[in-house]
Amino acid sequence: MEKSKVYFTDFRAKLGEGLPMKLKRLLKKAGISKIDMENKFVAIKMHFGELGNISFLRPNYAKAVADVVKELGGKPFLTDCNTLYPGSRKNALEHLQCAWENGLTAMTVGCPILIADGLKGTDDIEVPVKGGEYIEK
């Protein structure tokens, strides 16, 4: 098996070059420009965090990714799915409220935010995979 390339940047920031700018450079170095995004919807899957915790990426990083997608002609949007467990992300309305309270808004990330599985987390489709098998249907 071929070894994967690993890209690294440190957290030190120089005047005029913060972490979001470094993230943009990393994306380009990793080959994001090889992906045809011209006039296509581009989902940026992200965890919006639970209320009261800090285990999610900050809005400025999401904006950096969305900006690169736009530069490549894509139409980015941030997305996540509702949770199966009770909490602040169990339905789309509360999920979006949670995202907003954690600083993730269309204004701060530079693109729309959509909950992928609908209002109650029940909007889904089955996609058959050639050569795949179902464990339980």
For the regions a language model picked out, list residue spans one by one.
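N-terminal and secondary-structure boundary signal
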Residues: 1-137
